[in-house]
């Protein structure tokens, strides 16, 4: 697959198989139950059968840390949801979807961060969780690190 997008995180063509915990999307298992990943998009979800991969690996929830409309110019066209995918596509397949609008390269309040940590903790009681922002690095890593510090202290 050739990446015709401005951002290397929009396609798997920039990554080796060892850099993708799930086939076809930049992703890494941080713990046995928490997957960090780049944002998915509708064509990719279909072509790599992402929902099927979620079911096969036990992922029951997806946490989206993007703001609607974010990074509209570097990847596939945004859906009416304001994201590169329709969250309903996951929910109709019994995968919970949570969205916390957190500005890229921005900060968030301690209250908001604690709310996100609590939701991540709750979601983990249902099964494995995939967390993404745009690239699956900054906000995704901060949330997962905060969860690990808070719950594994």
Regions found by a protein language model. Name each.
Residues 127-149:
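A phosphate-binding catalytic loop at a beta-strand-loop-alpha-helix junction
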Residues 13-128, 151-152:
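Cysteine-based protein phosphatase catalytic domain of the PTP/DSP
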Residues 1-12:
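Eukaryotic intrinsically disordered, low-complexity, charge-rich
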């Amino acid at each position: 697959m050739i990446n015709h997008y401005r951002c290397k995180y929009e396609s798997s063509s920039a990554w080796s198989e060892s850099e993708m915990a799930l086939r076809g999307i930049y992703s890494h298992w941080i713990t046995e139950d928490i997957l960090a990943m780049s944002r998915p998009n509708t064509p990719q979800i279909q072509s790599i059968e992402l929902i099927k991969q979620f079911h096969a690996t036990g992922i029951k929830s997806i946490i989206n840390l993007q703001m609607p409309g974010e990074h509209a110019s570097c990847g596939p066209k945004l859906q009416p949801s304001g994201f590169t995918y329709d969250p309903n596509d996951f929910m109709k397949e019994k995968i919970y979807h949570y969205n916390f609008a957190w500005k890229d390269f921005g900060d968030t309040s301690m209250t908001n961060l604690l709310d996100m940590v609590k939701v991540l903790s709750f979601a983990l009681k249902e099964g494995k969780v995939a967390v993404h922002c745009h690239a699956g690095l900054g906000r995704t890593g901060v949330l997962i690190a905060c969860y690990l510090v808070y719950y594994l202290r």
